[in-house]
Design a protein with these regions (language model features):
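Conserved N-proximal alpha/beta basic substrate-recognition cap immediately N-terminal to
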Residues: 1-12, 23-30, 36
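Short, conserved charged micro-motifs
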Residues: 23-24, 56-59, 235-237, 284-291
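Conserved anion/nucleotide-ligand pocket segment
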Residues: 32-54, 192
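Short amphipathic alpha-helical segments
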Residues: 45-47, 225, 273-278
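Internal nucleotide-binding/catalytic subdomain
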Residues: 47-189
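Short beta-strand/turn micro-motifs at beta-sheet edges
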Residues: 112-114, 214-216, 262-269
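Active-site "cap" helix and flanking loop/linker of ATP-utilizing ligase/carboxylase catalytic domains
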Residues: 141-163, 181-252, 265
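Generic C-terminus detector
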Residues: 262-266, 271-324, 328-329
Length: 329
């Protein structure tokens, strides 16, 4: 993906690939910490080090190349500039040529409030993402999404399906690509789908037949927010088979409860994974959607259930600031 972006002029973090320790360390000294050192390959999700000092970065390189602590995955390292700013998820549909953007969203990857703790698959999300205003939306389409779809076609692999660009928006408003996925995001999908009024199967059929240029997507103007409820211990080891209560009460409160790590045992819904449920609600504002979603979270329970209590905090802060400015004006 990094080579693809370099080839097609798509903005991303500066990077280099190395098999030689001295060359890797020279790159580190050229760019300086904090810097990201990755084992180039599969390393059970643990082959990524965010080094805060030169010493940490050099140690990571030596471990991965000389010590080879990650086995085959560590025979080469990718070293990337560490990007700062605010993340956003930008998902579109493509039919090989035409592009239909879907609603913007933002997820929360860290386990704990304030974006602290280990990274997870995602502890909650909301849509739309206020950080992506109309000007930035146009820029992302022009500088990232359109060159990506054109680039895949030019490389002989025209793409039909869902394209997910994970973006970092710098403090000055510059979008850069963190990652691509050729699927929807989880948990971004849940709030995005809550807002979609158009027929998803009809849009998928249009993409398959190369007719996305004839389609538009109709969105509920309200915000949607989803809170992931996870098993205690996740993303590490956790218990399974815990009986879940309160699902009917959450539905009666107006929430949509999306199941992930659940199964049926003797007629009862029990936990079967790390991320168990995503409790999602619509609201006139992100703050309103959050309040409704947390009402659902508060009536669902099982032994060891955990959830972040601050999903949507960036957008809620923006809403409060906007309201304050309106009152002052």
């Amino acid at each position: 993906a990094k080579d693809f972006m370099a080839r097609h002029g798509i903005p991303t973090a500066a990077y280099g690939k190395f098999t030689d320790i001295d060359e890797a360390i020279a790159f580190i000294h050229d760019h300086g910490p904090p810097i990201v050192v990755k084992a180039d390959g599969l390393a059970a999700g643990k082959g990524v080090i965010i080094a805060q000092t030169f010493a940490e970065a050099e140690a990571a390189v030596r471990d991965m190349l000389a010590g080879n602590v990650f086995g085959e995955a560590g025979h080469r390292v990718v070293i990337e500039e560490f990007l700062t700013g605010e993340e956003a998820s930008f998902i579109v549909m493509a039919d090989g040529k035409n592009i239909l953007p879907l609603a913007t969203s933002q997820d929360h990857k860290a386990l704990e409030e304030g974006d602290r703790g280990p990274n997870t698959g995602g502890m909650g999300a909301y849509s739309p993402a206020p950080v992506v205003d109309s000007d930035l939306h146009e820029r992302v389409m022009r500088e990232i999404i359109e060159p990506t779809v054109r680039g895949m076609a030019a490389d002989g692999a025209p793409f039909t399906g869902f394209l997910y660009a994970g973006l970092m928006i710098s403090p000055s408003g510059e979008p850069r690509v963190l990652e691509y996925n050729v699927r929807f995001g989880d948990p971004e999908t849940q709030p995005v789908m809550m807002r979609l009024r158009s027929s998803l199967p009809a849009l998928c059929l249009a993409a398959i037949h190369g007719r996305l240029d004839t389609c538009t997507a109709d969105w509920d103007a309200r915000a949607a927010l989803g809170v992931v409820m996870a098993a205690g211990g996740y993303p590490g080891s956790y218990d399974k088979g815990r009986a879940i209560s309160g699902l009917d009460a959450a539905a009666e409160s107006g929430c949509q409860v999306f199941h992930a790590g659940t199964t049926l045992a003797d007629g009862n819904v029990v936990t079967s994974g790390g991320r168990v449920l995503c409790v999602t609600a619509l609201g006139n504002t992100v703050a309103d959607a959050a309040a409704r979603a947390y009402r659902g979270v508060d009536v669902i329970d099982w032994d060891g259930a955990v959830a972040r209590r601050d999903i949507g905090y960036r957008a809620i802060a923006r809403e409060r600031e906007s309201e304050r400015q309106h009152q002052d004006g």
